[in-house]
Each structure stands twice: as C-alpha cells, then as structure tokens.
Amino acid sequence: MRSSQTLSKYIDKATDQFNLEPNLALNIEIADLINEKKGNTPREAALLILKRVNSANPTVSYLALHLLDICVKNCGYPFHFQIASEEFLNGFVSRFPNHPISRMNKIQSKMLEMLEEWNYMLCKNNRHREDFSRIHDIRELMAFRGYKFPAVDEDSIAVMKPNNSLRSAQELAREDLEAHKAKLQELLRRGTPMDLAEANALMKVIAGYDEENTEDYSALAAADLESIRSKALRVKQFLVNQTVSLEEGTLADAVESLKVYQTKIARILREENEDEYYVQKLLSLNDLLINVIEECSNSDLIHSGTNVVSSQPNVVESHVPPSSNDTKQESSLIDLMKLTEEPAVPSPSLPTNVPANQSLSMLSSLSNSMSSTSNGALNSPSYSQAAIPNTNSSLTSILQSDSLMISTQLTSVQKSSGFASYSVQFSNCSLTWPVSEVVFQVAVVKSLKLQLLPHTGDAIIAPGKQNAAHEIMNITNIPADASDLRIRWRVQWIIGTDHRVEQGESHLPL
C-alpha cells in the first residue's frame, strides 16, 4: 500500500502543471521504482500515467508523455505488457477522432511518434512480440483511417535496440521466467475463461511440465554464437575483398561491434562453469574475435583508430586455460600501460589480481552489462592524468567525462601491515542515455598485490544516477613509508551504442 502511495505521489510530482520542463531525474526514479517493486506496480504505474496523459491540461499531458517514454525505455517486459493491453491502448488513443483532422496538436503528434516507436521495437524487434500484437493492431487501424505516422528516430529508440545482444542460456531463461510471471499475474487478474485457460497453459510451461512449448535456451544461445562467428568471418573476408558487404556499414563499426561481443563473452566465461561444450564454443569464438580484431588493427583500411581497435584481454576464471592469443593480447596491453619513473599528478582507480613475476601486474577486465542508446563512430582513447576534484571531499574523481565518472574513496588503511582498501564508485553523468558494458583495467608495480571483490550495484547505470555501482579494492604489500599508490588504468564503456575509451595515470591517496 505504501509503495502505491509513493508511486502515485512521484507521478503527480513529475507531471505537475507548474513544472517548466520534464524532471528527468524523477522520471528515472519512477522507472527504477517500477522495476524494483514489480508485482502489480507496472499496471498501477501505466494507468496512473495514462490518466495524466488524458488530462485536460496540455502541460500535464506533455509531461506525462515524457514520463511514459522514459518508463517504456527503461522498464522491461512487465511494463511493456501493460502498455500493450486493450485497456491501456484504448485510453491512449481516445484523444484521436475516427478520422484525422487537418492539423495535429503537439500532444497528438508526440503520441503518434511514440506509438510508431512501440510498434517498431516491441512488435518487430522483440523476442516476445506476440504478446504486444495489440500495439501493431491499433497502429494499423489508425493508419487505415488516415493517420500518418512519423519515421522512427534511430537515436530515440537506440536504448531499446537489441544490437550486439549476446546472452547465455541462463540469462535467456531468467528473462523468459520474468516475462511469464508478469503475464501470468495479469491473466489471473483478468480472470475471464479464456485468460484462465491461457494461464493454466502458462503455469505448465513455468513448472517445466510442458516441454513441447518450452524454449531450448541452449540452442538459442548457440545460435547467437554462430551468428557472431559469421559476422567475424565476414569482417575477415572484407580485409581480403572489399566488395564483401558488412552489416554495420563500415569496417570501424564492424570491429567495434566485435569488441562489444568479446567483452560480453568475457563476462559469460566468468559466470559459466557448468556446460563445458558451451564454454569451449565461447573460447573458440573468443580466439576468432581476437584474431580478427588484431588483423583489423594491422590493416591499412583503418588509419587512425588502431589503439581502440586493438583487442581486449580475454578474462576467464582459473579453470579455463588461456589461449596463446590471450597471452599476446595481455602483453600488448601491459606494454601500453607500462609504469615509468616519471612523477604523476594524484588521481585514483580500479584493479584486479596481480602476479609478482612481472614489472607490471596483469590486466584483468571488469565488465558490467548495460543497455544501449545512440549511434556513434569509433572513439580514439584520450589520456587523462590530473584528478578532478569531486563535490564530496572524501571522494577523488579519476575520470569525469560527459557520460561516466569514476571516483575512489579510501575506506581502510593499516600502514603497519601494508594494507589499504578502496571503494571505487561509478556514476552516469549523462542525463539522456544509460551507461553499459563498463570494462575497467588497472596496472600496478610488481611489488603490490591487489584483490577486487565482486561487483555490487547497478549493472546498467541509469541517466544521471550517482554512485550506482561499486567495487571494493584491497591492496597489500604497501611500503610503510608510502604516501600514495601509483597506478595506470584504462576504461571503456558504452553510452548508448557509442563506444568510449579513456586511459590515464593516477595516485591513490593513503
């Protein structure tokens, strides 16, 4: 009951007629609340927002449409299923007469634009498209009556695009289970004989009794790997014969796409330890991606972006043997980030486990999966050294770009035993797009030992959200007379579909 009151209060505040513009931070908070509470919350939110959309006050309607747009793009299947319901859609198009008038107002134009986006992303490019068929039906009916729908803006829908999607069988199963539970709850709520019959069939699927209608997630995951393999081979063919067409349009974009796949493969390898056959396929594909990316980086077809094109180190748990390509790549990254004896300006960062037999610790990538948003070309990494002061005096920001901020905070230090612990925090500085696929790499001198505890917080950092993800970093073997710890770091992430790379040198204060 309290969550319902909170939700209603937030929606009223976000769509207040005295707001001069949409409150993006509050809209994102409402979307987070819907995702967190689940249950009946998506339905309540959809109907509350719909009521505000149909307000007689155009300001309230306009703000409600912006809130609805944020919720659709940041919430998952449970909310999408509600906006595809007959009750919601009938209320949504109630503003429109049977036949179009000569001139649409701003509210109606925005609604047509949103309906076209939903049709494109939910009815044509979604695994559960059959559950959203009413959106397509209402769109076709309005088109038949003469309504003209605007072209879909690629930048606007990029956050919902399934581009570069690679999920393991377990992830696909979890995604479907969440969708089935949300659909089952709604069918039981309606309670018509037809809905109850469908709910009964759905419960058999959830329980695993109806194997005939249960997806083979292993086959789906394997098909995704084969699709990526085909793309990699096509890029390899392109290097020999430029008449071969690439899905991404340019070689740089194609290589960028392969890099994103490689990051996701590294994450899945860390999590997957049961299906040995699937693990071997991942390792084989990972080796292929490394080879193709390396060939591209040495090709004359790419002139300026070779640093970004170079492949990432393969990250696998100790039970998976590293390939020769992995060793070669680690060496290239170590050379790139080799520590020098030059003084550096203070500034902190993020690490992993370190062997003591090298002048520099091995780099280990820490990837976090997130959503996408806008199209962008390959970016060359920029080099940052100076620490940027944070508004919180206990935090030191080692990176503060227009989309990602990384800060560190010393949480514990024992100089007598040579131990220090840091909290590394990730924030999204963008007010438009979420940040995803963060891969942070750190190098330290061989005398230090590093331990990174498991990632906590948001995998997808919503626009404007501060300190949404955290890592705890423990460092040992610190000399007793040390006043700071010198490191070099490299980070890459995705803001929308735009891949960013930064690298720098920092000092962690003690």
From Swiss-Prot:
GO MF annotations for this entry? phosphatidylinositol binding; ubiquitin binding
Residue ranges of domain GAE in the record = 391-510
Q: Does the keyword Transport apply?
A: yes
Q: Which Pfam families match?
A: Alpha_adaptinC2, VHS
User: Where is the VHS domain positioned along the sequence?
Assistant: 14-150
Compartments in which it is found: Golgi apparatus, trans-Golgi network
Keyword annotations for this protein, in alphabetical order, are:
Golgi apparatus, Protein transport, Transport
Q: Where is the GAT domain?
A: 177-301
Biological process (GO), any one = retrograde transport, endosome to Golgi
**Main location as per UniProt:** Golgi
Listed InterPro entries? ARF-binding (IPR052653), Clathrin_a/b/g-adaptin_app_Ig (IPR008152), Clathrin_app_Ig-like_sf (IPR013041), ENTH_VHS (IPR008942), GAE_dom (IPR008153), GAT_dom (IPR004152), GAT_sf (IPR038425), VHS_dom (IPR002014)
Entry-linked PROSITE patterns:
GAE, GAT, VHS
GO CC, sorted alphabetically, is: cytosol; Golgi apparatus; nucleus; trans-Golgi network
Its job: May play a role in the regulation of membrane traffic through the trans-Golgi network.
State what protein this is by name: Probable ADP-ribosylation factor-binding protein C1F3.05
Organism in which the protein naturally occurs:
Schizosaccharomyces pombe (strain 972 / ATCC 24843)
